[in-house]
Amino acid sequence: MIRVYRIVRKPYSRTPLDGEGPYRFGGRWSSPGTRVAYLAEHLSLAMIEYFVHIEASDPPKDLVVVAADIPDNVSRVVLTPRTLPPNWRPVPAPPSLAAIGDSFAAERKSAILVLPSALVPSESNWLVNPLHPQFAEIQVQPAEAFHYDARFFGAAEPG
């Protein structure tokens, strides 16, 4: 079993893996209209992945971290930097990357797509397909309050 993580605002913590955000807005690995949930293999990576999308002058005050336990038998496909197009890290992401996640979700051949993080390529993000039959085997843990350390926002260390 592996535990993966997602940081969300509290109102979204009741259904954190429903894929609603990517469905509405898309992401690096999915187009709008594709329902997948983005998680990270480490809490620290989830922190970085969320942090790059917030306004440092007005960070959300209602963040929570959600952990999900994925049994070893849940099907997954693993892609590495070597198996991706050479331009997989830039911002904005090329549309060819969203096509990868769109195909993964539509084909429903596996429940998980493991991909390298564009921010930390040696670590992985996990796309979960909430429409795959094995999704029911994923155990979502209760959300816990989460706050970034003030130093992320330029606050000086005390003392």
Segments (PLM) and residue ranges:
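Generic secondary-structure signature for well-ordered alpha-helical cores
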Residues: 12, 52-55
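Active-site and NAD+-binding cores of ADP-ribose-processing enzymes
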Residues: 2-18, 31, 59-159
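Short, flexible, solvent-exposed loop/turn segments with mixed acidic/basic and small polar residues
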Residues: 24-29, 57-58
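Extended catalytic/binding region for NAD+/ADP-ribose chemistry, centered on the ART fold
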Residues: 28-53, 127-131
